């Protein structure tokens, strides 16, 4: 999931440099959403995984 967020972030940066505003905005939005999902899953797995150890 983190790789998808990084991929969309790179697409957004390249699109912004080349001047494709709509594509850059969409890719940035997707990257932000994926990053937030990844962060929530990471924190949840960290806290729930501590009880097993």
Swiss-Prot record:
Its main location: membrane. The keyword Glycoprotein does not apply. The chain crosses the membrane at residues 4-24, 29-49. It comes from the Bacteria. The keyword ATP-binding does not apply. It is a multi-pass membrane protein. GO terms for cellular component: plasma membrane. Pfam families: DUF1328 (PF07043). It is found in: Cell membrane. Keywords: Cell membrane, Membrane, Transmembrane, Transmembrane helix. Coiled coil: none annotated. NCBIfam families: PRK13682.1-1, PRK13682.1-4. Belongs to the UPF0391 family. This is UPF0391 membrane protein PSEEN0090. It comes from Pseudomonas entomophila (strain L48).
């Amino acid at each position: 999931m983190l790789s998808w967020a990084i991929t969309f972030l790179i697409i957004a940066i390249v699109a912004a440099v080349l001047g494709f505003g709509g594509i850059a905005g969409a890719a940035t939005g997707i990257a932000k959403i994926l990053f937030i999902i990844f962060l929530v899953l990471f924190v949840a797995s960290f806290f729930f995984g501590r009880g097993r150890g």
